Structure formats: C-alpha cells, structure tokens
Amino acid sequence: TQWSSSAASDVYKRQGMRYGEPSLGEALKKMKENNVSKIIVLPLYPQSGSPTTSTTYDEISNILKNWTWVPDLVFVSGYHDNQDYINALAKTIKQSFKNNGMPDKILFSYHGMPKRYLENGDPYYCFCHKTTRLVAEKLKLNKEKFDMSFQSRFGTEEWLKPYTDDMLLDYGKNKIKNIHVISPGFSVDCLETLE
C-alpha cells in the first residue's frame, strides 16, 4: 500500500544498523523516548534469509526482552517479488540501457552466503532466482541475455554458485566485453556494489 504524503510525514522514522551506527538499540531507544506505540521493522534485504533478516529480528528481540515498554511490532520479511520493487529495478535498468546502450550480457549479482543455508532449507537462493526472473520478464530479456551469480564470499566454506568473479572471468575468455552488472540484493549502493 502507498501512503499519502501527509500520512508519511506523521510517521516517526529511524534507521538502525545491524553492524554499524546508529545501532538498532539506539534507534529503538529514540522511538521509546518519542512514545512510539507501533514499530514497523523493514530490513533492507529484498531477498530475506536467515543470516540477514532473521538476525535483525533476533537482535531486536534481544534488545526488547529486558524492556518493560514493548511496542506493537510488525516485521516485513522481504520484498523479493513485490511489484513496486520489480518495477523500480526495471525502470533503473532501462535508464541504464538508454544512457549506456544495450550490453552483450546482463549479470544479476547477489550477495552470497554459505551453501549450507540452502541445503538446510533457507529460501534466499530461490528468492534471488525469482527476483531475477521477474525483472528479466519485465524487461523482456531472452534467457541468453542474462545470468545470475553470487558475490562477496570469504573463508574456505563452499558458497552459493556461480560466483560473480568466475562469471566475469568466463565472459572475458569468451570475448564478452560489454557487461552490465545489476545488484538487486542491495537496496542502496555500498562498498560491495561500487568496488
């Protein structure tokens, strides 16, 4: 649902970060100080998963468990297939095509996670595939025009595949030079989308 501008201006908004500042605890404290009675938690992970969205919920629960003031809580678990999100991605990508031309390949690159999460039933991998499919359909891309991959792995454990760096090396070996890398799992640009 969409809010009118007047309704949105009446909403007390705070950002809190799971691994940065301001922290989730600081954001919740500000809400308490402002007598907020209902909190909508919107983690900025479009494709929810246990290492991302679930840890955010756990952290908020851990903070609130010792408080005597507990507001109504609504958790938004993800929006990987939300039509507004898909439309926004498609619009941004179309603008990139307009500004930079149509690439030879489009690579949808998502943040990776250890493969064991998928093997244990975590839906993240499937959500990434669904987002990719919906955006590709919206853009009317044929299947040969795009691929999907995962970035940002570390350690020795096997992570979700294919890996973005391996895909880019393969493109180079196959003389595919004009590539657009799309990062639909990141709501805003950050170190992992810019580097």
Residue ranges of predicted features:
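Redox- and metal-dependent alpha/beta enzyme cores, enriched for Fe-S-associated oxidoreductases
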Residues: 102, 115-147, 153-162, 167-168, ...
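Single conserved hydrophobic/aromatic residue that forms the stacking wall/gate
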Residues: 1-8, 12
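Hydrophobic alpha-helical segments within soluble ligand-binding/sensing domains
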Residues: 83-104
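Short helix-capping segments at alpha-helix termini
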Residues: 10, 64-70, 138-143
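Glycine/proline-rich loop-helix segments at beta-alpha junctions forming the active-site rim
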Residues: 30-49, 57, 157, 161-195
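Long, hydrophobic, well-ordered secondary-structure blocks that form the structural core
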Residues: 14-88
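Short, surface-exposed alpha-helical segments at coil->helix boundaries
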Residues: 53-61, 125-133, 195
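Short catalytic/ligand-binding loop motif for oxyanion handling, primarily in non-cytosolic enzymes
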Residues: 23, 47-52, 83, 114-118, ...
